[in-house]
């Protein structure tokens, strides 16, 4: 989720209780040390399996924006001295990690971190270099509160937000003896697009390229994930190198960096260059200028594990929508309701009966390929359509095209969501400033890593 997003519908839970440490050439277990990740020469990686949980969609308050998010990745770990169990959303689009903080009389307040119970908790004063210089990438500048502590406010496009003080604390990772002292936000106020689900998550683990992100503070050279999209084996997150002999060679696309701040360009996001869109191998007639960020930074393309679907700027979305609609004419029946726009951004939907789904109708859909410099993501079959929960017309279910219109969100960017990254090995190579992509079967890869069924 890039820094303006917070996903809440389908929850992918990372279970840290089942740590696996594997070498680059085998899947055998071995002891794990986090310090080994400070160098790209490390031959060890940490693998965390994913779990899924379906979250109801009918609790969203009416005063929030129509757009809301659908998927979060969370990790369970312990923080403080003595350790307190917490769960954090893994967000590749956010920088500052934060915990929901609450000073409670309970010995272990549910889904809250109590700083008063930790002897290692250390608040950051607003006069510190951390507060004055390392928060410059925040959308809202850090400020000084009445206690002269560094105060941070984070906000998202779905009207969710969190605010509190920056602090340093010890984060414990599994059985590792190499615990790390990290800067994070101790948030006393958290407001989300689904209050019921907000209470189930302690905080957020920022994974973008900002100086205060978890990945930057820990010094990881690389991390990868593979999402299968199935309940039996949802996938995994891998921290460290992925030079496995059995892994399909990755195609790399460079990460884009700019030196001059621009109002609509997120400089710490994982930004790549979208060069075109293909339908069944044929490039759509889209002007190249529409795919390149303009002088304000609007139009960047971000790869985001925290956003479920893919969003395209209006002209590009319109071109793809029109072409896909023409190619599915005679195959699918359009859902004719001019007032219905799924999640406020997806307005191309279809009525499909269970019988037609079982007959394999989705395999007849045209393949949509997102073309980048040096790599592609091809989306075909089931991932092209998403079944709208609890909406039926007669015996038919309603399925919507899984590409949305960024303009309807008021967002000046392209976002490649994880729904279209299913069964792809996605590697974030921070040392060489690039993203690697390769189609794989995530369940098979998980088995090779010793975590699949």
From Swiss-Prot:
Pfam families in the cross-refs: TAXi_C (PF14541), TAXi_N (PF14543)
Disruption phenotype annotation: Embryonic lethality when homozygous.
Propeptide boundaries: 19-57
Tissue expression per record: Expressed specifically in developing gametophytes and developing seeds.
Gene Ontology molecular functions: aspartic-type endopeptidase activity; peptidase activity
Keyword set includes Signal: yes
Protein name, UniProt field: Aspartic proteinase PCS1
Organism of derivation: Arabidopsis thaliana (Mouse-ear cress)
Chain's gene name: PCS1
């Amino acid at each position: 989720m890039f820094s303006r997003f917070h996903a809440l519908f389908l929850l992918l839970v990372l279970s840290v209780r089942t740590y696996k440490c594997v070498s680059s050439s085998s899947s055998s277990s071995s002891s794990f040390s986090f310090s080994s990740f400070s160098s790209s020469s490390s031959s060890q990686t940490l693998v965390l399996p994913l779990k899924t949980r379906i979250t109801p969609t009918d609790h969203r308050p009416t005063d929030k924006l129509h757009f809301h998010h659908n998927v979060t990745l969370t990790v369970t770990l312990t923080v403080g001295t003595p350790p307190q169990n917490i769960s954090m959303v893994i967000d590749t689009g956010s920088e500052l990690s934060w915990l929901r903080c609450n000073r409670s009389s309970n010995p272990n307040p549910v889904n809250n971190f109590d700083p008063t119970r930790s002897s290692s908790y250390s608040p950051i004063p607003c006069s510190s270099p951390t507060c004055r210089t390392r928060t410059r990438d925040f959308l809202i500048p850090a400020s000084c509160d009445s206690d002269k502590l560094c105060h941070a406010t984070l906000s998202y496009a779905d009207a969710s937000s969190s605010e509190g003080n920056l602090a340093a604390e010890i984060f414990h990772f599994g059985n590792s003896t190499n615990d790390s002292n990290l800067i994070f936000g101790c948030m006393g106020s958290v407001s989300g697009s689904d209050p019921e689900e907000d209470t189930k998550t302690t905080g957020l683990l920022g994974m973008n390229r900002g100086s205060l992100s978890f990945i930057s503070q820990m010094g990881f050279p690389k991390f990868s994930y593979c999402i299968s999209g199935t309940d039996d084996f949802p996938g995994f997150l891998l921290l460290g190198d992925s030079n496995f002999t059995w892994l399909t060679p990755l195609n790399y696309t460079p990460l884009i960096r700019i030196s001059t701040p621009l109002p609509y360009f997120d400089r710490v996001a994982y930004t790549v260059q979208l060069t075109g869109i293909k339908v069944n191998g044929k490039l759509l007639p889209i002007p190249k200028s529409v795919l390149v960020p303009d002088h304000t930074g609007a139009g960047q393309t971000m790869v985001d594990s925290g956003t479920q679907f893919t969003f395209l700027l209006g002209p590009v979305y319109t071109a793809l929508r029109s072409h896909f609609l023409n190619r599915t004419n005679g195959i699918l029946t359009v859902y004719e309701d001019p007032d219905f726009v799924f999640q406020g951004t997806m307005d191309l939907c279809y009525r499909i009966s269970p019988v037609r789904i079982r007959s394999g109708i989705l395999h007849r859909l045209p393949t949509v390929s997102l073309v980048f410099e040096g790599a592609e993501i091809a989306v075909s079959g089931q991932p092209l359509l998403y079944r709208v929960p609890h909406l039926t017309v007669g015996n038919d279910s309603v399925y919507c095209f899984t590409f949305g219109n960024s303009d309807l969100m008021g967002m000046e960017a392209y976002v490649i969501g994880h729904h279209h990254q299913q069964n792809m090995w996605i590697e974030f190579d921070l040392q060489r400033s690039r993203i690697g992509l390769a189609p794989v079967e995530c369940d098979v890869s998980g088995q090779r890593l010793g975590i699949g069924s």
